[in-house]
Structure formats: structure tokens, C-alpha cells
């Protein structure tokens, strides 16, 4: 059973998924079908841009009033939201479920260093 906060998160996230998809579609990014590999590569490219900003000191974005890493992390999430809506994936619910699952895991499970 979802609590009030989780239910609100799902509602808000799914609303933003629709908005992200519509903005992308309205700007011509859904005119041709992309394969799943392309979609993932575009998400990855945003993470690579975040890495480059951090390598250069994480200066301000050229577009919005945030750091470059903040902007690129936002771009990753926007791309995920766009894809999630297009593919009819329940990412908001999966986030909640995964966080609950992670809470139950042992400290540094699997003996991993990072």
C-alpha cells in the first residue's frame, strides 16, 4: 500500500513524463522511431556531458541558472521520462519499489568497494 507521499510522487512524476514526451514530440524528436539502443545511448550521452562539466570544475550552465552537472542530470531524467512515457513504463512506481528494496539490503552488499 502506497503512502500519501509516494502516491503524490507517482502522480507528479507521471505528469512530468507526459510533459517531457510532449515537449520532445512537439520539437520533432518522435517523427522517426528510435531503437532502444539509440534511446539508451542518448541517456548515456547526457551522463557523459555531466562528467565533462565535473572534469572542468562544474561551472554554470550556459542555458539555465544551475551548474552544468545539475543541468545534465536533469537532461538524463528528462530523457528517461520521455522514454518511459513512450514505452509505457512504470518508472515512478519502480523507483519507489527499488528504494524500498535497497533499504533492506545489507551494508555494501556483495562485498563491493563502490
What are these regions (language model features)?
Residues 1-114:
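Flexible "arm" and connector segments at domain edges
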Amino acid at each position: 500500500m502506497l503512502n500519501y507521499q509516494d502516491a503524490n510522487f507517482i502522480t507528479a512524476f507521471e505528469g512530468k513524463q507526459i510533459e517531457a514526451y510532449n515537449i520532445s514530440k512537439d520539437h520533432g524528436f518522435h517523427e522517426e522511431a528510435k531503437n532502444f539502443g539509440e534511446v539508451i545511448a542518448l541517456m548515456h550521452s547526457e551522463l557523459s556531458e555531466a562528467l565533462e562539466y565535473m572534469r572542468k570544475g562544474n561551472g554554470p550552465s550556459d542555458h539555465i541558472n544551475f551548474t552544468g552537472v545539475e543541468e545534465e542530470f536533469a537532461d538524463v531524467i528528462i530523457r528517461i521520462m520521455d522514454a518511459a512515457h513512450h514505452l509505457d513504463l512504470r518508472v515512478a512506481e519502480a523507483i519507489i519499489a527499488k528504494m524500498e528494496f535497497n533499504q533492506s539490503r545489507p551494508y555494501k552488499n556483495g562485498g563491493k568497494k563502490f
